Amino acid sequence: MLCEMPPTTAAAPTTTRDALLDAGVAVADAHGLAGLSVNRVVAAAGVAKGTFYVHFRDRTAFLDALHERFHGQVELAVAAATAGTPPGAERIRRAAEAYLDVCLVNRAVKALALEARSDPSLIASMAARHDRFATAAIPSLRAMGWADAPATAQLVAAMTAEIAIRELDAGRRLPASRRALRRFLAA
């Protein structure tokens, strides 16, 4: 969410894989994590069940792919929002705003990621993505004079994620929360 590196997404996936992922988003939006079954996904995508397993080892791999694709979208948005911005508070602010905006547009995937945080088979990959974003904020925090930049980066990432959760629940931007994050970064 505080990414300051170029996107790391792979080349565009196949059309069928994209259709399955798109169907997964629609199913997640309608039924949440508990209702996200392989059968519902393939029915929504209009493909045979065996096709699912050509692209994904199992449901867990599919959930991980949904989360990875979401983070690819975040990385692209953050890269665009921070292009040409030197390390510092403004760069982190722009990155956080881009992350929050992508979360609002991708409500189903963000909600799914929140539900999946307690899934032991997904915790490691989700934590690695979180850490990648937090780590990317360290140069900006150091430029701002934070001696404890790594710990601060984790806290800023957590605050930004909490704002995303609150906005997800509200179904809209929460300007006061975003202002509070900006004020924290200006400290």
PLM regions: where:
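Generic hydrophobic, amphipathic alpha-helix propensity
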Residues: 13-24, 41, 66-78, 137
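Hydrophobic alpha-helical connector segments
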Residues: 65, 79-105, 153-156
